Amino acid sequence: LSQSTHLMANDRETVETAIAGDIIGIYNHGQLHIGDTLTEGERLGFTGIPYFAPELFRAARSKDPFKAKQLHKGLKELGEEGAIQVFEDELGNLYLGAVGPLQFEIVAQRLATEYKVDAIYENTPVSTARWLTYPDEKTKKEFETEQTLRLAKDADGNPVYLATSIYNLQTTQKHWPEVGFHTTREH
């Protein structure tokens, strides 16, 4: 963990050693997530931090088509940070999920300042999301074939069902009782 930084108020100091309770900053390129535990070889098991199914959704696209890669990169990194939940369907459409409207404003501001991307946020027919688990590969393949237009992946590549309404979700759950539809996902 080279270049770890001890954080105290406005002070920053490079440190070689940290002990339990120290708050340090670690330069990260997507390998570490909020709540990860670092040890020197011990195998520890903790319950993860839950991600909750978002309640608000927007579709995002760049105003400048030449900045689509920056938009994808920015949203992926912000999703990894936990600033917002990002879902991508098979066609490459990006859906942002939040528990409050302020999250969209923060993401828009950060995309503009940190990634130089001016994005358009549009209403979307998505009203709720559920993480999916399957009992076997056969069920997974059949479900994905039938529900292709409602499926996406989250920032970590986990399968997600994007329902257009609670009725749509309940109908799909009745039709597919063996598929697990989860309101939370453990990180």
Regions found by a protein language model. Name each.
Residues 30-31, 65, 98-105, 166-169:
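Helix N-cap motif at beta-to-alpha junctions
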Residues 88-137, 148:
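Conserved structured catalytic cores and adjacent interaction surfaces
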Residues 66-87, 98, 106-112:
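Short, contiguous, well-ordered secondary-structure segments
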Residues 1-57, 69-73, 80, 90-93, ...:
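Conserved nucleotide-binding/hydrolysis modules and their immediate coupling elements
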Residues 124-187:
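C-terminal interaction appendages of subunits in large macromolecular complexes
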Residues 50-64, 122, 127, 131:
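Short glycine-/aliphatic-rich beta-strand segments at the starts of folded cytosolic domains
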Residues 42-46, 78-83, 111-120:
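A common structural junction motif
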